[in-house]
Curated annotation (Swiss-Prot):
Residues 82-106 have a biased composition (Basic and acidic residues). It is a peripheral membrane protein. The keyword Membrane applies. GO terms for molecular function: calmodulin binding. Homodimer. May interact with ROPN1. It comes from Notamacropus eugenii. Sperm surface zona pellucida binding protein. Helps to bind spermatozoa to the zona pellucida with high affinity. Might function in binding zona pellucida and carbohydrates. Residues 74-117 are annotated as: Disordered. Residues 122-151 form the IQ domain. Testis- and sperm-specific. Keywords: Membrane. One of its GO terms (biological process) is binding of sperm to zona pellucida. The gene is SPA17. This is Sperm surface protein Sp17. Its main location: membrane.
Length: 153
């Protein structure tokens, strides 16, 4: 609701947008005939899940939005990860054995090696870019030559 010629903006509570996005997504997915009844059932189901798992998706979404808009990545060391911001279903176990750590380091190294094998693709892309620029430059020169020949006549 807005008031004409007013600088007043109402603030949406944190997490409310995430709740509405989730409801909208489910409505579009299910295409129900009675949307208000579907919304009531959706929110009841969401409340039951929140009571059982002690996980509030609205609160989690608000934290994610806050992190997106107030990026504090430069304050956190590069190797540190925060498990508080991951949903409980997808969070990793807290205890890791040294073997798992070694496997993670091996996968990171192999990923870096994969990136370096794309040199041929990068060279092909560079050739395409250079050819496009040369064509553009040639068309520009032809246009200038045509304009100068028209002016001379």
């Amino acid at each position: 609701m807005s008031i004409p010629f007013s600088n007043t903006h109402y603030r949406i509570p944190q997490g409310f947008g995430n709740l509405l996005e989730g409801l909208t997504r489910e409505i579009l997915r299910e295409q129900p005939d009675n949307i208000p009844a579907f919304a009531a059932a959706y929110f009841e189901n969401l409340l039951e899940k929140r009571e059982k798992t002690n996980f509030d998706p609205a609160e989690w979404g608000a934290k994610i939005d806050d992190r997106f808009y107030n990026n504090h990545a430069f304050k956190v060391p590069s190797g540190a990860t925060e498990s508080k911001e991951a949903p409980p279903e997808k969070s990793e176990p807290e205890k890791e054995t040294p073997q798992e750590v070694v496997k993670e380091q091996e996968t990171q190294v192999s990923f870096v090696e994969e990136v370096s094998t794309d040199d041929e693709e990068a060279a092909a892309a560079a050739v395409k870019i250079q050819a496009a620029f040369r064509g553009h430059k040639a068309r520009k020169e032809v246009k200038i030559m045509k304009e100068s020949s028209i002016e001379e006549q």
